[in-house]
């Protein structure tokens, strides 16, 4: 899609409002809007909404229709029906003008829906568009060709009011701007949580046992039992499968690719939500860069406890600030996002967990490396102040506590640039994340099927500490001089080769990493 074809969600003038896609049912009524705005307990079964029923085939047709309508210049604005359904979509569309909407014209899956149910239903695969009246027949013709229902449900007006009709009678009206720019804002009380006392350094087992146990831990072990349940090569565009940093899809007909990653660490955010928010953004961007992509944008899901409690509100505010600082340092926008609040059980909140998805552009998918080769030079890129606080090592062998190290955002941005700019020279690039340097190196060996002889520290903090700012890269000896470090520290730590990692058999590492497969009850 070219920049010129980007379509606003807001109406830009008087015209018709059409709705196309799936029919509207009771599935998801009050879904995301309820779950994100109140606590639910054992006595609230009546508040638990029915789950939205997704239909990937209809979703694919909806995408194709939307693209064709945009390319044909048939729509003035376009908006999907997400959380809060039509109530949200129409509010955003009406913000600068007004809308008259006839809810009795909305195609229904169940004929006995009441008007308020139609407004807040979160049935999937539905779009609304503002269309010049003379172009409505052309819009309907395209929808019919794709076998998607399309109905004119109202008009864009210049009244500045969103009005809802039922069988010709006005049943609700409200100034449109009151639902958007002039909506009441929460004024939440913020109370910083007391700092965690740093616990003594955990006393873990010897290096070999610690590494094997970390590889088998829930947050690090092989994830293929999850993604192999889905067709991750559908469309035959998958260049790099899930499992190593970011997945990559080819953007046909060119050789460019789209790298996608998803990251979050609730333990880090619990110890320091500002650092945790930045951590999620930076790790997602590093993963994209390790896969050859220049990070372009992020989306997010903010998973927190009850924001009406001052400490929880402070966690949310701090995490958002950390994410904003990281995005500014990287020069990337937040293009979408959602929240999941009030996540508590018997008054105990979940870890504050900002989750970030990042997308990046790969110039040439043919150059992406996924395995080091015999004789490759192994380098450590970056310089970070590592910490055991909030690490997988600490969680495995002790109580989580202490303070994670602050990020040096300029250094992080420089490392990410180094990773994607030089990726065509790497046989593999992998960021140091959960499990620290030791796990990063073990994963490189496992993915490559080749061991390595490395000069690595023996201190547990240097081996298993976390907090970003580091990546392992490998390349042929003759390529080292071609690397454009641009101020990023580079240190040669060894050579790939053999069937062990510093004497630890590759077969043992792989066996530990693949040993635990979740039962159906865990999924």
Spans of model-derived segments:
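Mobile "lid/hinge" segments at catalytic clefts and subdomain interfaces of large enzymes
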Residues: 1-146, 152-165, 180-182, 186, ...
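Non-catalytic terminal/interface segments that mediate subunit docking, oligomerization
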Residues: 7-10, 30-31, 190-339, 343-438, ...
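Hydrophobic/aromatic beta-strand patches that form the interior of the parallel beta-sheet core
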Residues: 18, 260, 379, 491-494
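Glycine-/charge-enriched secondary-structure boundary and capping motifs
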Residues: 75, 79-216, 319-326, 330-335, ...
